[in-house]
Amino acid sequence: MRLVSVIKRPVAQLLLTVLLFCGIAADAQENSPYSRYGWGNLVPSTPIATRGMGGIGIGYVDYDPRYDFKFQYPKSQTVNFLNPASYSRLKITSFDLGFDVENQILRERNVTEKYKATYANVSYIQLGVPLSRKRNIAMVFGLRPISRINYNIRNYTRELNPVTGNSIDSTLTIYEGTGGSYQAYGGLGKAFGKLSLGLNGGYFFGTKDFSTKKNFINDSVLYYKGNYQTKINFGGLFLQTGAQFSTKIGSSTRLVLGATASFKKDFNAKKNLVRETFEYDGSGGIVTKDSVYEEKDVAGKVTFPGTYGAGFTIEKEERWMIGADYTIGNWDDFRVYGQKDSVASNWKLKVGGQFVPNAFGANYWGRVTYRLGFNYGPDYIRYNNEELKQYTVSLGFGLPVRPARFSNQYSNINLGFEFGRRGNNNTALKENLFRLS
């Protein structure tokens, strides 16, 4: 869900803050084996206003008729961080908070059981401020997650005697991981007539804490358990650039072309390694028996790839919009301390549109924005060297809180409903995801 308004409502701000912390607290329920690879599952990188349109956004600027009755240039009240060039059209101070509620269903091939989980996460929090409406300059500040790591995998096996081949003991191996990555950013957009240019810059940081715990199961012999744990932290400055070109293609129809680029970057990192034997205490906590090996603050690099995209929208004044994006990510360049992971370069196609029956009509549902879209493309993660086909279909609504023509305190609640699938019946794991934003 998304709320945007002029910031003059302390009660609403308090409510949104509470929702922010509730979303963070609920994150612990997520469990995705896919997030073991790369730097985890990528979070949707679009504002909720466009998620209902398949996640388009590179050529997106919403039209606000309060500031442009001649439809000469787009005038926006949506903070579209996907393309910072769109900031230049921002005409009101906007506070924007997005959060998701997700339902995950994970099924393993040839296994009837399935894993289910429901959890909530914060999508982003940002503030957009027009610096000069006349000169079309605006800036944005925000914080958003880029990826999430949450998994807990248990594997039971039988150990065999290497000489006789007979079964000796059972073992339980637990693979666990937490972490993710985030961007704290500031952005600036400036329009030069039909051309808008923009950039986002700030601090990109993250952590990955993963371990393998091995437990021999034997009723008569006591074995210490083994823990192999690694924690990596990285951080550094990043830069994203964007451009949009807007032109009329009819008396009340506009075309916007857009492009974005984020370049390959090496980030400084620190790594801690622990190899130890342990036992569990009465409350399930770990009690170290012997530290076999330990190494702290090992310096290195984490390399994130360049990502590039192009897109367009065509909009009929106060009526409809259609658009598409195409993006590529050079994930073959991804490295952690020089090591390649189970990832590969990927692409994604997004298509969507929206329709407003009567933007200034008396009927409320006529002023609602209705959205529909889909996206398709392989995930950047490879599971058992298998390409994970991925698609999402989406439906969205823009719910006006007040009629725009009667108030400068224009609030809008955007809802997005998405159904996504990663993998299929031929891959080792298939994941279905239902998301309410």
Predicted region positions:
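Short, flexible coil/linker elements and helix-boundary hinge sites characteristic
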Residues: 9, 23, 296-298
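N-terminal secretory signal peptides that target proteins for export/translocation
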Residues: 1-8
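Bacterial N-terminal signal peptides
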Residues: 12-23
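Sec/Tat signal peptide C-region and signal peptidase I cleavage site
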Residues: 24-28
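Subset of outer-membrane beta-barrel
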Residues: 29-437
